[in-house]
């Protein structure tokens, strides 16, 4: 295996590593699992038919997965994972967004020690839909989900237009960001 080069051998090694990690998690040999990117084409086999390791881990370990990406400057959770862009608006529901906000809040408290995390929620459409001119998901799905989460005690704010949110540096005002897609 050559590092950084996709190959069937590298895919098999990645799948074996993921299977071993699941065994170790089940045997309580691990407290946490951090994954790195995989080459989704190389890893496909009769034993691995998932669009990513997030889906594999959910199938093997059960539960509803929250994909989260972290750096020193940013923590980001994702509502939808590994689906075509054309399917995102059909996959978004108020309940799914509320669930992801609950999961993200729980992780921020348990894993990062943030007592009352503030979460920014990004819009799906450009300019946060511009009042329905560029899409209705913000008004019919995302904003009601943010309001419901807030009523449950989650400090969720938005939806914010994704393009301007990062360019303006507003992400620094929050402990995490919830985006609609990966």
Where are these regions (language model features)?
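Proline-centered loop/turn at the N-terminus of a beta-strand
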Residues: 32, 64-66, 75, 155
């Amino acid at each position: 295996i050559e590092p950084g080069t996709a190959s069937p051998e590298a895919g098999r090694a990645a799948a074996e590593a993921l299977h071993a990690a699941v065994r170790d998690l089940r045997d309580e040999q691990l407290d946490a699992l951090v994954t790195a990117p995989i080459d989704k084409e190389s890893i496909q086999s009769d034993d691995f038919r998932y669009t990513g390791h997030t889906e594999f881990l959910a199938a093997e370990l059960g539960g509803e997965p929250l994909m989260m990406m972290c750096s020193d400057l940013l923590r980001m959770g994702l509502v939808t994972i590994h689906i075509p862009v054309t399917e995102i608006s059909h996959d978004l529901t108020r309940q799914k967004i509320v669930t992801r906000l609950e999961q993200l809040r729980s992780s921020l408290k348990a894993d990062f020690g943030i007592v009352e995390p503030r979460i920014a929620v990004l819009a799906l459409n450009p300019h946060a839909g511009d009042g329905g001119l560029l899409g209705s998901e913000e008004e019919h799905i995302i904003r009601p989900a943010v309001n419901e989460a807030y009523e449950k005690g989650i400090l969720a704010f938005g939806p914010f237009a994704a393009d301007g949110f990062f360019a303006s540096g507003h992400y620094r005002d929050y402990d995490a960001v919830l985006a609609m897609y990966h």
